[in-house]
Each structure stands twice: as structure tokens, then as C-alpha cells.
């Protein structure tokens, strides 16, 4: 029985690791060149910000609101990229995007809770903090692009 449990743990952990991976390995140039990667990163950033929002909202509502706002800012861009990749209408893209985000948010929350039990911190010993910074860089790049576009028009 113990062998079966150990085997299941080895099988289950790589599956989770495939879903939750370090985002900050990718550079912005790669995102500009690959729509599928752009979708993956935006979906992951929305999910990560949503997970942090859920985990801290009771103890730190103001801080949670900042993560919530980041997720909401990035969501429309994820929907637009998915719409382009799959050549689907807006309603189908929204539905698929939010289903993907919901699943990945739950995975991030599980990952952070497990880490919290081990390290007494959601972030310590993981790449989550780096990825939050990376997601903020993505958001800032989008905001800058929008601002520059408005200036030209």
C-alpha cells in the first residue's frame, strides 16, 4: 500500500508542475512573436493574481484589491489573443478563457497552500514572487503601449 501511495505521489506531482510553471523565464520579445505563448502567459498572470486575491482577501482586503485589479486589467487581452488564435467569436473566447483561468486559479491556490504548510509562506521557496513581478511588467508594458497609442491618435 505504501508503494502505491508513493507511486501516485510521483505521478501526481509532475502533472501539477506542468500546470504551474515559472513565467518569468520568458522575455517580452518571445511574447510578441508567439500568440500561443502570449495567451499562456496572460492566462497564467490572471490566474496567479486571482489566486493571490482569494488567499489574502480576508486578512488584507486593500492589497487583495490591487491583485484583483491586475487580473481584471489583463483579462480582456487574454480573451482577444484567444479569439485571434482560435478564430472564434467573443462569447466563445470569453467562456473558454474564464474556464481556463478558473481551473488554473485553483491550481495556483493549491500550490500556494501546500507551500504555505511547508514553508509557512505562500511565496517562500517558490517562483511565485518573481512571477507576480513579471506579471506586473507585462501589465506595465500593455499600459505603456496603450498610452503611446493614445498620444499618436
Residue ranges and their predicted role:
Residues 30, 55, 59, 144-152:
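Extended amphipathic alpha-helical interaction segments
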Residues 13, 41-42, 131:
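Generic detector of short, well-ordered, non-transmembrane alpha-helical segments enriched
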Residues 18-36:
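Short N-terminal segments immediately surrounding and downstream of signal-peptide cleavage
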Residues 5, 50-51, 140:
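Residue-level marker of positions within ordered structural domains that often coincide
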Residues 3-14:
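Sec-dependent N-terminal signal peptides
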Residues 4, 17-22, 153:
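Helical anchoring/docking segments at protein termini
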Residues 31-88:
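Short N-proximal segments of mature Sec-exported proteins
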Residues 75-153:
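Compact alpha-helical subdomains of small soluble proteins
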Amino acid at each position: 500500500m505504501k508503494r502505491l501511495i508513493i507511486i501516485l505521489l510521483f505521478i501526481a506531482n509532475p502533472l501539477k508542475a506542468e500546470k504551474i510553471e515559472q513565467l518569468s523565464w520568458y522575455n517580452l520579445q518571445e511574447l510578441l512573436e508567439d500568440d500561443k505563448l502570449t495567451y499562456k502567459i496572460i492566462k497564467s498572470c490572471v490566474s496567479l493574481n486571482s489566486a493571490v486575491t482569494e488567499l489574502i482577501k480576508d486578512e488584507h482586503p486593500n492589497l487583495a484589491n490591487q491583485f484583483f485589479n491586475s487580473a481584471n486589467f489583463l483579462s480582456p487581452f487574454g480573451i482577444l489573443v484567444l479569439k485571434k488564435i482560435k478564430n472564434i467569436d467573443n462569447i466563445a473566447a470569453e467562456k473558454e478563457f474564464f474556464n481556463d483561468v478558473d481551473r488554473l486559479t485553483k491550481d495556483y491556490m493549491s500550490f500556494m497552500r501546500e507551500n504555505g504548510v511547508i514553508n509557512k509562506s505562500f511565496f517562500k521557496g517558490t517562483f511565485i514572487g518573481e512571477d507576480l513581478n513579471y506579471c506586473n511588467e507585462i501589465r506595465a508594458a500593455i499600459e505603456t503601449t496603450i498610452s503611446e497609442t493614445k498620444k499618436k491618435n
